Curated annotation (Swiss-Prot):
One annotated GO biological process: translation
Name of the featured protein: Large ribosomal subunit protein uL18
GN (gene name): rplR
Subunit structure, interactors included: Part of the 50S ribosomal subunit; part of the 5S rRNA/L5/L18/L25 subcomplex. Contacts the 5S and 23S rRNAs.
Function: This is one of the proteins that bind and probably mediate the attachment of the 5S RNA into the large ribosomal subunit, where it forms part of the central protuberance.
The UniProt record lists the keyword RNA-binding: yes
Family that this chain belongs to: Belongs to the universal ribosomal protein uL18 family.
Amino acid sequence: MVYNCGTRLERRKKRVRLKLKRNSSLLRLSIFKSNRHFYVQLIDDKCGRTFASASTLEREVVALTNRRVNSDSVKIVAKLMSDRLNKLDNCKKFIFDRGLYKYTGIVSEFANELRSYGFEF
């Protein structure tokens, strides 16, 4: 008998989230990407609160990137997110939740850009 445990992407998402739950004391930086947009949120899972967010839908990003999701637009989103995280107290270390996406392309570009601003994950 064969059991369908979901698609490959759903299994990867579950596997990544399970590993993240082990370190639930830290805040979680969650990303979502589509073919047209890139979204980032800093979430506290204990109280279910979002502290900061940034995306390619914001005016600063749309004006510079012409509604394209590429490494340039992701770098601008990383800059926006780092500015918002610097305003918060004690948010230099968190968990990077890549979700169902592989750590290549714009996901790794975003992570490296945030690390260059002094954040640890």
